[in-house]
Regions:
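Membrane-helix exit/interface motif
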Residues: 26-30, 53-62, 82-99, 125-129
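Membrane-interface transmembrane-helix boundary segments in multi-pass integral membrane proteins
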Residues: 160-197, 251, 256
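Interfacial segments of alpha-helical transmembrane regions
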Residues: 63-80, 137-145
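Alpha-helical transmembrane segments of multi-pass membrane proteins
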Residues: 16-31
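Loop-to-helix transition at the N-terminal end of transmembrane alpha-helices
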Residues: 35-51, 70-74
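N-terminal membrane topogenic signal
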Residues: 1-16
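Alpha-helical transmembrane segments in multipass membrane proteins, preferentially the mid-helix core
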Residues: 120-136
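Membrane-interface loop-to-helix entry segments
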Residues: 42-45, 108-121, 181-185, 189
Length: 256
């Protein structure tokens, strides 16, 4: 990452951490407590984004390489899922799984928007602006489903214990396990396609970056401490460069 982009990232990533904290604290000012919020995928994905953004900011400050692109892609996908599911499924009156939106006090309403809108947009922007390009693989889209499926198992087991499910599309009490299975297949395919979209955008940005370099952007300057090839070559007694071992020219007396 260039010095200029690193400075922008150092300002951008703490803003993500602050947005996550603001969203959780403001939401907790409503009827729900912090511990009551923890079982929700929304909170878990936001916490993951906040922790990862803080870690990435620390690495940028220490001038270390960016964290794992596969892990960053996973975190970005999960917070994207949070935003997409909320706006298209839970808060959409046309959705069969729409949840009636309560009259929230202003702090809680702001917290809700931080968690479902502001943080997802900031996380996607961070991934698009600062991550190295061309490192995501198609197979990652399948691997990234591990956490949502693990979350499903957690939510179903918890539902058996407390008779309460965090989301209507995995509510076994209302849908039955057959209905939950249908929802699971549908959402798993959608999440897989979102993962593929992330990989596709990564590759598209990589090609765009390569095309810009081909149009005349100068290549990065060599390191000042990089040894020159000629300087590193051994020289013989006559001052001429000596051939590498195994490739020495035969002497005149040995020919024939």
């Amino acid at each position: 990452m260039s010095l200029r982009r690193g400075r922008v990232a150092m300002a951008f990533r703490p803003a993500i951490v602050i947005s996550v904290l603001a969203g959780i604290v403001l939401t907790a000012l409503g009827p729900a407590t912090v511990t009551g919020l923890l079982p929700y995928f929304t909170i878990q994905s936001n916490v993951a984004v906040g922790v990862f953004a803080g870690y990435a900011a620390w690495r940028t400050w220490r001038e270390l390489p960016e964290p794992s692109s596969a892990l960053k892609g996973a975190v970005t996908l999960y917070i994207t899922i949070t935003g997409v599911v909320y706006h298209l499924v839970l808060a959409n009156p046309a959705s069969p799984f729409a949840v009636a939106q309560p009259d929230r006090a202003l702090p809680e309403a702001l917290g809700n928007q931080f968690l479902h809108t502001v943080v997802p947009l900031l996380a996607i922007a961070d991934w698009a602006l600062f991550d190295p390009r061309g490192r995501l693989r198609v197979r990652y889209a399948i691997w990234w489903l591990a956490f949502p499926l693990a979350y499903l198992g957690f939510a179903l087991v918890r539902g058996l214990i407390v008779a309460k499910y965090p989301y209507p599309f995995i509510d076994a009490g209302q849908l039955g396990y057959d209905g939950v299975a249908i929802s699971t297949v549908f959402f798993a395919v959608v999440f897989w396609l979102l993962g593929l979209l992330l990989v596709g955008v990564d590759r598209g940005l990589s090609r765009l970056s390569g095309a810009r370099r081909a149009d005349g952007t100068p290549p990065p300057a060599p390191r000042a401490d990089a040894p020159k090839a000629a300087a590193g070559a051994h020289r013989g007694d006559d001052g001429a460069p000596e051939a590498p071992a195994g490739q020495r020219q035969p002497s005149a007396g040995s020919v024939g």
